[in-house]
From Swiss-Prot:
Keyword terms, alphabetized: G-protein coupled receptor, Host cell membrane, Host membrane, Membrane, Receptor, Transducer, Transmembrane, Transmembrane helix
Species whose genome carries this gene: Human herpesvirus 7 (strain JI)
Gene Ontology molecular function: any one: C-C chemokine binding
GO terms classed as biological process: calcium-mediated signaling; cell chemotaxis; immune response; positive regulation of cytosolic calcium ion concentration
Topological region Cytoplasmic: 57-83, 143-159, 230-245, 311-346
UniProt signal peptide: none
One GO term describing the cellular component: membrane
Protein name per Swiss-Prot or TrEMBL: G-protein coupled receptor homolog U12
Amino acid sequence: MICYSFAKNVTFAFLIILQNFFSQHDEEYKYNYTCITPTVRKAQRLESVINGIMLTLILPVSTVVICTLLIYYKWTKQTITSPYLITLFISDSLHSLTVLLLTLNREALTNLNQALCQCVLFVYSASCTYSLCMLAVISTIRYRTLQRRTLNDKNNNHIKRNVGILFLSSAMCAIPAVLYVQVEKKKGNYGKCNIHISTQKAYDLFIGIKIVYCFLWGIFPTVIFSYFYVIFGKTLRALTQSKHNKTLSFISLLILSFLCIQIPNLLVMSVEIFFLYIANTSCLGTIQREIVQIISRLMPEIHCLSNPLVYAFTRTDFRLRFYDFIKCNLCNSSLKRKRNPLTIKN
């Protein structure tokens, strides 16, 4: 897959660059770490409040969706996209849990050591990459399904291979994220997780990592989903029968909702890279950069909230499965024989 080969090359390149960059420590990077104004504190506190509100919605909804899809897929195995959707929602849940830990750590409600900080940030970056790439995979499968009108790809080994490749590539893309993690020690080796940049070359490498993430989290998903939105609008309506119009409308809604979140996210990431590039160490520049980074950190949470709501509860099929889940009917063999959903549904 493209993401796998790209991630592999990027990871090896970063490791080589890292070895060359950090072999020299004579150039000290001057960064204004002391400019913490009331505006920055209020923005950080507002970020924590917004994260708390989103997490109270994301975690319960994702749990219900995961349980419903797991039980339904275990007893019916009717749709090929169900395993992909399950891993997508699990990845979103892991991302939300890491946000919860980082928020508690920033508010001094919990302390982490160096290894835990690196692990949390690694999972944060890997889950974000995995979720965005998995959305593209699901859209590709839906396009192939509607175009061919049949599913010829029900091999579990094939599904496991795709998930495994995507998992490994996401993990490799997340490796650079842990390079700058340091702990502001408060209780022994435990304290607050921070991003510390010690040299100018390390700062340049940090900007390079941000550019790669801008491609993986911004440009790549936006281009892929824009392409699919155009294809669904022009090609699939001419190929599919009228009975699939609801499915086409549903897919268009999914992609359009994604683009409504992703395009502003891409703009915010581009502005963040711009502020990092100009390296304005004044107090005003630090405040502007911090506010942009706060907005950039909130955008993935909006994705995590929208995925289960749009991909699950806006679809009639899932609502029926959810009602069966509440009524404990998913394990009813007679109901299982009665219901034989279309292969394109999930």
